[in-house]
């Protein structure tokens, strides 16, 4: 079944967005088809960020309705072009976010040369402007979404192994943490480091501006001897917490983050980003490890 997707013309969409913004500020702005009668002149800024059309006869009529007819018949509308080119600010732009250091004025063309489609019609202090192209509206900040949260995980270490080992792991085994570390992650981004203290943890460094990419890849040879030798990265997650932006900023000020009671009894074991089990954080001789309490084998029977 094919999807019926509504097509949107980006040019007209930008014109419509600007029309809505102008109307919100009390200025009349409409999307409509211009008349193809008479002569037209295309204007733009030097950077070509916007372009618009004017009808010189309409501008003369706006200035002096009584003289407009005689002026057009005498060819006076052609004088509008050099006047526009010679005047530094011939009119005030009716769209607030537009600017123009230098106006580019093209030669008059007949109405048949106007582009297809609707144009945005807005009145300036000199006459009507018919905008053909407009840039995007400036972004308006809506403040922080207070209900939005980010998932943090506090990692105490990792171990590199191979796929063949996973099939031999069972409940009661102890997975040793080969690389001890205390790092804070949000999704695949490393935010900083933390220290474990009595009653919780303290985030020592929190760099939100320069977030590092987590490297989930393991150095391997160019060719693998078999699927069982595929690399696996085990990650041991001490704690997870969803935080607001304000809470995240507070962590960077080394505030104490309280941990749930017995958090050491439920350390998550991730393999290449997938949760495979959990267990208790233990220390075997001089090496930290996790004694497995729950394990999801590849057969899915939990053994």
UniProtKB/Swiss-Prot annotation:
Function in brief: Involved in a secretory pathway responsible for the surface presentation of determinants needed for the entry of Salmonella species into mammalian cells.
Keyword terms, alphabetized: Virulence
Gene3D superfamilies: SpoA-like (2.30.330.10)
Record Pfam families: FliMN_C
Transmembrane segments: none
Keyword Plastid appears in the UniProt entry: no
Protein name (record): Surface presentation of antigens protein SpaO
Classification of source organism: Bacteria, Pseudomonadati, Pseudomonadota, Gammaproteobacteria, Enterobacterales
InterPro entries: FliN-like_C, SpoA-like_sf, T3SS_OMP_SpaO, T3SS_SpaO/YscQ/SpaO
Native source organism of the sequence: Salmonella typhi
